[in-house]
């Protein structure tokens, strides 16, 4: 057993007390990103090593791997702790997104180590989508590079408000303060163009030598700020979803027998209580919450992030992909939207193309109407393009086959974020973040016969996994 873990368990008075203490620690999800070879994997390895999160057998294996694949001479190559793929070790780079977990006495952490090469930018966007904070590594010898700008923009585009600019490899520039100050000034000049109200901090460090990672550096006495670990332990993460209106995307209709009908999913934002009036979109039908069922039994109230099953007092038509919200909330379904897109496919995105899109539990089709612009990552300017290439980022106008209950992504990432799926290969080809909503033509002018409506209701009630569209909502809209 890890000696530090054993000591923590002993200090808490046993395994059970230690596990209870762990449950009450706050959780910080963060990612490391930046240009290739800036030392992202080495930094994570250093964090794990210096917080004593590495077991003895892992340390022994690391010594052996450093001899075979290491790039640091006689020193331990800490990057090998997270570069797990054979291709990564052979090339000395990160390709896939690697997740690692560790904890200190103050906080629990989930780390996403993302690739630095431009051709793996799509992997980086995947890692950033669930994080609260981004560590942007900059090689002290190279300064701010294009990929640094790209990752900064993607991080903020995906809603990350806390950026820690870690100026790495200070040992290779003699730990000079003027180098740190110059890069800091360059990045702040660039950051003026980034969207949102950002919390940006700067830490000079050496991941290889351990300077200012978990302990203060004796080589940079001119720096009086916190270490990287201290920043991670103390940064105040205010999750906006806790303060947002209630949103509950239905992922599954749970009907184990004739006496029970519940709607399972994860509460995306806000809270819900037993007895609360709720509304179902896109139909607009209202009911009230009879029970909140969880793995641990019934609850009176549930908060954002909890996986629950809601039982309603009325037997109404709800299927996978529908959205439940408070009855007094207004959210008009929309068929047209402007979407910030990170394109991840070799074939460019162009007007006239159609893709399947998935939003929370809802899956439908969408058509690309126009590309307003592509972002030039070098200077964040907008330029006109006819198509969006691989790793391109731009604003795209889309029309959905049916009205969707959408939020602006910056307000609610779950109900404002979607993915593009190729209809032939079923491969995810892009990620989208809702920027603007256009409610015109939210409901198509289509008339259905009484038989069609009855058959549709029957299919939706007894075969919810078919994801049949609610034709009744279309009829009301047409009327």
UniProtKB/Swiss-Prot annotation:
GO process terms (BP): hydrogen sulfide biosynthetic process; sulfate assimilation
Sequence positions that bind GTP: 34-41, 113-117, 168-171
Coiled coil residues, start to end: none
InterPro entries (alphabetical): CysN_GTP-bd, CysN_II, CysN_NoDQ_III, G_TR_CS, GTP-eEF1A_C, P-loop_NTPase, Small_GTP-bd, SO4_adenylTrfase_lsu
Reactions it catalyzes: sulfate + ATP + H(+) = adenosine 5'-phosphosulfate + diphosphate
Pathway(s) this gene product operates in, as recorded in its UniProt entry: Sulfur metabolism; hydrogen sulfide biosynthesis; sulfite from sulfate: step 1/3
Annotated region (G4), positions in chain: 168-171
Region (G1): 34-41
Gene3D superfamilies named among the record's database cross-references: P-loop containing nucleotide triphosphate hydrolases, Translation factors
Keyword Nucleotidyltransferase found: yes
Domain tr-type G: 25-239
Keyword Nucleotidyltransferase belongs to the record: yes
One Pfam assignment: GTP_EFTU
Keywords of the record: ATP-binding, GTP-binding, Nucleotide-binding, Nucleotidyltransferase, Transferase
Region (G2): 92-96
EC number: 2.7.7.4
Spans annotated as G3: 113-116
Region (G5): 206-208
Description of how the protein assembles with itself and partners: Heterodimer composed of CysD, the smaller subunit, and CysN.
Family per similarity comment: Belongs to the TRAFAC class translation factor GTPase superfamily. Classic translation factor GTPase family. CysN/NodQ subfamily.
Function: With CysD forms the ATP sulfurylase (ATPS) that catalyzes the adenylation of sulfate producing adenosine 5'-phosphosulfate (APS) and diphosphate, the first enzymatic step in sulfur assimilation pathway. APS synthesis involves the formation of a high-energy phosphoric-sulfuric acid anhydride bond driven by GTP hydrolysis by CysN coupled to ATP hydrolysis by CysD.
Name of this chain's protein: Sulfate adenylyltransferase subunit 1
Protein species of origin: Salmonella paratyphi C (strain RKS4594)
Taxonomic lineage from the root: Bacteria, Pseudomonadati, Pseudomonadota, Gammaproteobacteria, Enterobacterales
């Amino acid at each position: 057993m890890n000696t530090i873990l054993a000591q923590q368990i002993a200090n808490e008075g046993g395994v059970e007390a230690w596990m209870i203490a762990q449950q009450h620690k706050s959780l910080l999800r963060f990612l490391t990103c930046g240009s290739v070879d800036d030392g992202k994997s080495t930094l994570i390895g250093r964090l794990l090593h210096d917080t004593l999160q590495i077991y003895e057998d892992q340390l022994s294996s690391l010594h052996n791997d450093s001899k075979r694949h290491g790039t640091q001479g006689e020193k331990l190559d800490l990057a090998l702790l997270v570069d797990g793929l054979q291709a990564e070790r052979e090339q000395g780079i990160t390709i896939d997104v690697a997740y690692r977990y560790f904890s200190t006495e103050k906080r629990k952490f989930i780390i996403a180590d993302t690739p630095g090469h431009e051709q793996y930018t799509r992997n980086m966007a995947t890692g950033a989508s669930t994080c609260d904070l981004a560590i942007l590594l900059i090689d002290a010898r190279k300064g701010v590079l294009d990929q640094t700008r790209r990752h900064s923009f993607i991080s903020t585009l995906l809603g990350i408000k806390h950026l820690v600019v870690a100026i790495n490899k200070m040992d290779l520039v003699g730990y000079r303060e003027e180098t740190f100050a110059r890069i800091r000034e360059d990045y702040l000049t660039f950051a003026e163009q980034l969207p949102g109200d950002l919390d940006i901090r700067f830490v000079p460090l050496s991941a290889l030598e351990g300077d200012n990672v978990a302990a203060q550096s004796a080589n940079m006495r001119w720096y009086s700020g916190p270490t990287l670990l201290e920043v991670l332990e103390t940064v105040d993460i205010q999750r906006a979803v806790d303060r947002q209106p209630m949103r509950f995307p239905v992922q599954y209709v749970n009907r184990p027998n004739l006496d029970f009908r519940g709607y399972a999913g994860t509460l995306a934002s806000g809270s819900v209580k037993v007895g609360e009036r709720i509304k179902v979109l896109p139909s607009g039908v209202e009911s009230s919450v009879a029970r909140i069922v969880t793995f641990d039994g019934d609850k009176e109230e549930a908060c954002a992030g909890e996986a629950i099953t809601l039982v309603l007092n009325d037997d109404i038509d709800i299927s996978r992909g529908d959205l439940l919200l408070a009855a007094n909330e207004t959210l008009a379904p929309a068929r047209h939207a402007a979407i910030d897109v990170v394109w991840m496919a070799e074939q460019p995105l162009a007007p006239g193309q159609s893709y399947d899109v998935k939003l929370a539990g809802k899956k439908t089709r969408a058509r690309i109407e126009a590309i307003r612009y592509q972002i030039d990552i070098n200077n964040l300017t907008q330029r006109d393009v006819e198509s969006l290439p691989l790793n391109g980022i731009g604003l795209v106008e889309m029309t959905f086959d049916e009205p969707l209950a959408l939020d602006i992504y910056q307000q609610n990432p779950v109900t404002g974020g979607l993915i593009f799926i190729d209809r032939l290969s079923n491969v995810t080809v892009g990620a989208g973040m809702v920027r603007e909503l256009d409610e015109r033509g939210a409901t198509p002018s289509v008339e259905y016969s009484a038989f069609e409506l009855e058959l549709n209701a029957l299919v939706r009630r007894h075969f919810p996994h078919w994801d049949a569209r609610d034709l009744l909502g279309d009829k009301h809209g047409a009327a």
